[in-house]
Curated annotation (Swiss-Prot):
Homodimer. Probably interacts with PlsY. It comes from Fusobacterium nucleatum subsp. nucleatum (strain ATCC 25586 / DSM 15643 / BCRC 10681 / CIP 101130 / JCM 8532 / KCTC 2640 / LMG 13131 / VPI 4355). Keywords: Cytoplasm, Lipid biosynthesis, Lipid metabolism, Phospholipid biosynthesis, Phospholipid metabolism, Transferase. This is Phosphate acyltransferase. InterPro entries: FA_synthesis, Phospholipid_synth_PlsX-like. Belongs to the PlsX family.
Length: 332
């Protein structure tokens, strides 16, 4: 399998991207990576490592789309950007998937423009697998692809999300919930009430009902559906709360020698907690509904996050994910 990696995008690129690619090669049998970006810089980074040269390619791209760029304008004007070239490689069947840490809006625009949607899909959604108490994983979508949504979009997100969990996680009859401010059918705004009515009638899903944000990590449901505006706020709020909790724990530990001693006793447990809750453990988010694989890794991804994003992309390829999803969506 061959994956195009945007080597120049992200807070720590190209150091993190090149290192992550090398680490992925060590763990994923049969993987080949195309490092896309400024060839000279990539070659300098590669000198740090020993690797199978048959499994790494370099595709030169002289431009980089940065976080401050206007997404649509950047896609149109920076045609030779590392991000655009990655998507081109997938479009031209020279790679089976693309992974980028870059500007989300630009990546979505480039992916939609060049890869198109699966026939029958109204809008793609950003889908991310979150940890939960039962260690089964809960899929959240949409986390930012569509700030303005319609009930029919969310209804389709539910179908795609359910199919995702069937294919990717092996779940039978995944439970799908609608994020809302209360569990009752009458709760919420016009969008959630109309969406609820559609989800009740959707024969392709096992509809759980409404779910409040306080219960989304319990593991009682497999898929949580919301609009992109709400979903993006949910994602960033959860990340912020996680960072804050670890910050105050660290501050508390440093207050006295007794607390420092206590910290040593729970060091192993704290490492497990951090590993379970860090975004880097869960690889990339997929633009669900596109006709090819395009994954978005976090902008501040370190090498481990890059490695895990490549692992997720590899699993999608191995499972023939797009074709399996297409079977469901094209008959709707």
């Amino acid at each position: 399998m061959k994956i195009a990696l945007d080597a120049m995008s992200g807070d720590f690129a190209p150091i993190s991207t090149v290192k992550g690619a090398i680490e992925a090669l060590e763990e994923i049998e049969g993987l080949q990576v195309i490092l896309v970006g400024k060839e000279g810089i990539i070659k300098e980074e590669l000198k740090k490592y020993k690797y199978d040269t048959n499994r790494i390619e370099i595709k030169n791209a002289d431009e980089v789309i940065v976080m401050t760029d206007d997404p649509v304008k950047a896609v149109r004007e920076k045609k030779d950007s590392s991000m655009n070239v990655c998507i081109d490689l997938v479009k031209e069947k020279l790679a089976q998937a693309s992974v980028s840490c870059g500007n989300t809006g630009a990546l979505l625009a480039s992916s939609q423009l060049k890869l198109k949607r699966i026939k029958g899909v109204l809008r793609p959604a950003i889908a991310v697998l979150f940890p939960n108490k039962k260690d089964s994983g809960t899929l959240f979508l949409d986390l930012g692809a569509n700030s303005d949504s319609k009930p029919e979009f969310l209804n389709q997100f539910a179908t795609m999300g359910s199919k995702y969990m069937e294919i990717f996680s092996g779940k039978k009859n995944p439970k799908v919930a609608l994020l809302n401010i209360g569990e009752e059918e009458t709760k919420g705004n016009e969008l959630t009430r109309e969406t609820y009515a559609l989800l009740k009638e959707n024969k392709d899903i096992d509809f759980y009902g409404n779910i409040e944000s306080t219960k989304i990590m319990e593991g009682d449901v497999d898929v949580v559906v919301t609009d992109g505006y709400t979903g993006n706020i949910l994602l960033k709020t959860s990340e912020g709360i996680g960072k804050f909790i670890f910050h105050i724990v660290k501050e508390s530990i440093m207050e006295s020698w007794i607390s420092k001693l206590g910290a040593l006793l729970v060091k192993g447990a704290m490492k497990k907690v951090k590993k379970k809750t860090e975004a880097s453990e869960y690889g990339g988010a997929i633009f669900l509904g596109l006709s090819e694989l395009s994954l978005k890794a976090h902008g501040n991804s370190d090498s481990r996050a890059i490695k895990n994003a490549l692992k997720v992309a590899s699993k999608f390829i191995e499972l023939n994910f797009i074709e399996e999803l297409r079977k469901t969506m094209e008959v709707e």
